[in-house]
């Protein structure tokens, strides 16, 4: 099974149409990948579905980079990187 990081990168790549090679933990959804507010809502929904978690709106607003999404999911799933 793919790691959380690999699965998040796959989802971001697919949702935003970006090559996986351009996505790192430091990649900003808005500044680096050009995501708009609708893109970020769709990403959050996709991540919630993939990992069977709930991301509250206040937490979702704080997730600006790929690594922050990975860290949040790992914390929710009780896994350490």
From Swiss-Prot:
GO cellular component terms given for this protein: cytosol; membrane
Identification of the protein by name: Acyl carrier protein
InterPro entries hit by this protein: ACP, ACP-like_sf, PP-bd_ACP, Ppantetheine_attach_site
PTM characteristics: 4'-phosphopantetheine is transferred from CoA to a specific serine of apo-ACP by AcpS. This modification is essential for activity because fatty acids are bound in thioester linkage to the sulfhydryl of the prosthetic group.
Lineage: Bacteria, Pseudomonadati, Planctomycetota, Planctomycetia, Pirellulales
UniProt keyword annotations, A-Z: Cytoplasm, Fatty acid biosynthesis, Fatty acid metabolism, Lipid biosynthesis, Lipid metabolism, Phosphopantetheine, Phosphoprotein
TM stretches of this protein: none
GO aspect biological process, one term: lipid A biosynthetic process
A UniProt-annotated Pfam family: PP-binding
HAMAP family for this protein: Acyl_carrier (MF_01217)
The species this protein was found in: Rhodopirellula baltica (strain DSM 10527 / NCIMB 13988 / SH1)
Annotated gene: acpP
